[in-house]
């Protein structure tokens, strides 16, 4: 927690304020620092207190490492300033996207938001197991305040999906990128070209596997269907991992064990890892240095270009919305309470 500044008696404060005009001799109270406006969005203020409320875990870590006077250390102060700058940009984004969600009529209903928040909260809690409560406390969140963070993410995602809904990457775009960047598509190690589908739960993965096995659909059909989901931060995800070596692939062991027995063109049954449930497809085997053909990496290129185009479209829309909403960020105010080296 941020250390509280020394509070001077009110009469003395009056004297000091009078005598120190223009000399910066008065030390602000923590309450005054917290009320400092560090940004405005459409006239709505964001205070330093709001920013610092998201940095409780950082402050606790700094205090543990450097002691109670950690904010007096110029190097630590610089780190905190950078953290504040990052948080205030996030809060600005939340407010801008929240306003635009209402304007565009795309904000999810309260019921939809609650359902998604509860689902994500439980998935995170389940994934972290016994460490969840400690991690929450270490970051300075309660369950309710953490759910507020997730709520903003749900709303933000709805707007992001709207922004990029018409972004397309053609086969011609992919071919052009391949021709201009062939050196990127050379096997770095000997191994198997590997693709996978990643599902949130076992039921979804098993259903997809059964439909592939029955001939109702194909792995490639599902891969095409889901290949843009990663850039939109939602599952199922379809991902081309490129050539995966037999050893030191950097992948989790369960995934590696599921890939090993597969022959070219075969798929695995759903495999559980810490990330969810995977259906893996083994492709051709390539030696180190081999040029990977366009058809084998087209989906990977499309993902690369889609992410680039999505980012460009999102930035362009955000820049315009910030201008329309007269967004202002006061970087100098983010230094309040810190001793920054000049």
UniProtKB/Swiss-Prot annotation:
Q: What is the protein's species of origin?
A: Clostridium perfringens (strain 13 / Type A)
Q: What is this protein called?
A: Foldase protein PrsA
What family is this protein classified in?
Belongs to the PrsA family.
Pfam families this protein is in? Rotamase_2, SurA_N_3
A single MF term (Gene Ontology): peptidyl-prolyl cis-trans isomerase activity
Q: Does the keyword Glycosyltransferase apply?
A: no
Its gene name is: prsA
Q: What is the top EC class of this enzyme, as a single word?
A: isomerase
Query: Which residues are annotated with the lipid modification N-palmitoyl cysteine?
Result: 23
| NCBIfam families per record | PRK00059.1
* Keywords associated with the record: Cell membrane, Isomerase, Lipoprotein, Membrane, Palmitate, Rotamase, Signal
What EC number(s) does this enzyme carry?
A: 5.2.1.8
Classify the protein's membrane topology as the record does: Lipid-anchor
